[in-house]
Amino acid sequence: MISSAPLILLAAGGTGGHLFPAEALGVELIKRGYRVRLVTDARALKYSGLFTKDMIDVVPSETVRSRSPVALARTALLLGTGTLAAFNLMRRLKPAAVIGFGGYPTVPPLLAARLAGVPSLIHDANAVLGRANRFLSAHVKAIATSLPGVLDRDPALAGKTTTVGTPMRPAILEAAAVPYVAPETAGPLRLLVVGGSQGARVMSDIVPGAIERLEPALWSRLVLAQQVRQEDMARVRAVYDRLKINAELQPFFTDLPARLAANHLVISRSGAGTVAELAAIGRPSILVPLPGAIDQDQFANAGVLSDANAAIRIVQTAFTSDRLASEISSLAAEPTRLAAMAQAARAAGRLDAAERLADLVAKTAGL
């Protein structure tokens, strides 16, 4: 690739939910002959993938974690410092466009793009626009959403909004090619339990008790893979060993796309990326939205699949071992229902989002 090719800066918060769509778009842009760089915070340096360290620019940023005057002043100072650093980055790199994928680390580069006169746009994968993207929405030329109707009630923003879907990494596209095969009535039942990039303690608290409450005939059928925090590993392992469950426990699954494709049922949080991947691959799920969020984005995300009869949504206050055991037992006894849920999930997904978003980036940049 020649160095004079247009450069697109991808700005993303340093977690998988923001980085993975950015990576997927980056792959598509490189295919089209563009150069790409990632602007993010220090957390992204630990993720492997498309972006090597020489393709990453780290700018100071801060997430709003508290409403106290001291915390807000610190956040404002760091975001201001980050915006100045990002502005200098714009002057040095001269990008053709900047696209943000959400998270407060995207605020400095997107504001700097506005100050430097660089065309910019944002992508939001949630059913409800995130706080950072909400703040930036008035400062960008275009908005891309994964889901339709996100900004229908905001005429000022709806006019510059395009629904494209969530860009999928190559590993997800490979997994999406694996057809869903429902479990046989007496055959293995493959169950995957995940809790986001940092794990979720509620899964360690609830799932083992639910497995214990299942009919003993189901214990021998289960092939369980569960993401478990290191500090919870011993107590969770003890339950499964006592029940003689075929269980694999890991703090983090590096091959999650393949695991999603290989399982009959997924129990998970409902981050935007997870929901989009479940839909793209077409797998039935039990979704437990993260409680306490200001905009209840995970509740809305889970609703996309539960309303389509592709998932069962359980709020955390109702997520008990008894309730989960009941849902697993019912699904295990109805393989045709699992197959229907998988088909409904696949119908809700889209695999061409990276191409559609790349088209929008090129249009916004005037390329």
From Swiss-Prot:
One GO term under biological process is:
regulation of cell shape
Cellular component GO terms, alphabetically? plasma membrane
The enzyme class is transferase
The UniProt record lists the keyword Metal-binding: no
Cited Gene3D superfamilies: Glycogen Phosphorylase B
- EC number(s) from the headed UniProt entry: 2.4.1.227
Which of this chain's residues are annotated to bind UDP-N-acetyl-alpha-D-glucosamine? T15, G16, G17, N126, R169, S197, Q298
The record's catalysed reaction(s) read: di-trans,octa-cis-undecaprenyl diphospho-N-acetyl-alpha-D-muramoyl-L-alanyl-D-glutamyl-meso-2,6-diaminopimeloyl-D-alanyl-D-alanine + UDP-N-acetyl-alpha-D-glucosamine = di-trans,octa-cis-undecaprenyl diphospho-[N-acetyl-alpha-D-glucosaminyl-(1->4)]-N-acetyl-alpha-D-muramoyl-L-alanyl-D-glutamyl-meso-2,6-diaminopimeloyl-D-alanyl-D-alanine + UDP + H(+)
Q: How does it sit in the membrane?
A: Peripheral membrane protein
* Pathway the protein contributes to: Cell wall biogenesis; peptidoglycan biosynthesis
Q: Where, subcellularly, is it found?
A: Cell inner membrane
What are the UniProt keywords, alphabetically? Cell cycle, Cell division, Cell inner membrane, Cell membrane, Cell shape, Cell wall biogenesis/degradation, Glycosyltransferase, Membrane, Peptidoglycan synthesis, Transferase
> MF terms per GO, please?
UDP-N-acetyl-D-glucosamine:N-acetylmuramoyl-L-alanyl-D-glutamyl-meso-2,6-diaminopimelyl-D-alanyl-D-alanine-diphosphoundecaprenol 4-beta-N-acetylglucosaminlytransferase activity; undecaprenyldiphospho-muramoylpentapeptide beta-N-acetylglucosaminyltransferase activity
Q: Keyword NAD, does the record have it?
A: no
Family statement drawn from the similarity comment of this UniProt entry: Belongs to the glycosyltransferase 28 family. MurG subfamily.
Please give the function described in this protein's UniProt entry: Cell wall formation. Catalyzes the transfer of a GlcNAc subunit on undecaprenyl-pyrophosphoryl-MurNAc-pentapeptide (lipid intermediate I) to form undecaprenyl-pyrophosphoryl-MurNAc-(pentapeptide)GlcNAc (lipid intermediate II).
Report what the protein is called: UDP-N-acetylglucosamine--N-acetylmuramyl-(pentapeptide) pyrophosphoryl-undecaprenol N-acetylglucosamine transferase
